[in-house]
Swiss-Prot record:
Keywords: ATP-binding, DNA-binding, Metal-binding, Nucleotide-binding, Repressor, Transcription, Transcription regulation, Zinc, Zinc-finger
Protein name: Transcriptional repressor NrdR
Zn finger intervals (unnamed): 3-34
Cofactor dependency: Zn(2+)
Originating gene: nrdR
Annotated ATP-cone domain residues: 49-139
Organism: Pectobacterium atrosepticum (strain SCRI 1043 / ATCC BAA-672)
Amino acid sequence: MHCPFCSAVDTKVIDSRLVGEGSQVRRRRQCLVCHERFTTFEVAELVLPRVIKSNEVREPFNEDKLRSGMLKALEKRPVSSDDVEMAINHIKSHLRATGEREVTTKMVGNLVMEALRKLDKVAYIRFASVYRSFEDIREFGEEIARLQD
């Protein structure tokens, strides 16, 4: 790491501590040239995979789209915003854990449906009806029957 005082390349770590619930490392460093001390913080860069849409277009994962789709399905339902955020974080963790650089929208959609199924059955049916393009009332009935199993 370059010294912010003299721009020297050589610095040494004097002290390291975990901060922020263990998600960050705070390091005290000292420049080997000018002997000034400074603090740095390290955070893991957690990269989400790119999303392959049904038309084969690839785009970066968009957490806002995920949140918006879930909130639309959960509109006027008794689910706390904390529960929604936990579900979103779980989906993102699952996507990171795949280790893949790209995932399909189908995979993301299935993860959303799984999360909504656990949060609220009505929201699940709302989302599934749009996601799976239900054509008639029979398809709603079949999906509701599957929920009751």
